[in-house]
């Protein structure tokens, strides 16, 4: 990882949080805050871990966190491989956004082009306000939305992302979603006709991708249209 913020999730079971903090070269953010943070959707903001403050317990499978290293390097997790389906409890609170992640040391299918049946969006459609996954894109300094109109998207091991919960529902990530891939998590695997509109103010960039899909409407098609991430 570089020294930018990354969204991650433990790909193993049993990684102690205090041990992780002691071993990893986490950045100093401000005051006693360090480069490890949780997202709290009750107040729509980040909550930071503090230097020297012990946190009991392990990382929970499927929970996402923000991590920033002091220097570029690898992020390591130690534990046992998850060999069962993972159920992640979500809350709606202020805005419904939940930071979750891939709980396996293998890629998982994000949308139906990655796997027609066993993918996160299809399996969890009834539990999400918007059938979209949001990933932090360091190149554009913005969140990249992935939906059913996106190209085949396989979520990398330890990758964190946001979803928007309908209520106190569960997000289900199953063993059947796993696959072996040799590409990174942001590589588009297919090509097709599309229009991309780009807006920039000199520091931030926003893209709007327009696809031609048979059967789509000129209105809002949940699962095929996505809004800009509004969690922060």
Q: Which stretches of residues belong to each language-model region?
A:
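Compositionally biased Ser/Thr/Gly- and acidic/asparagine-rich
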Residues: 2-15, 19-22, 30-232
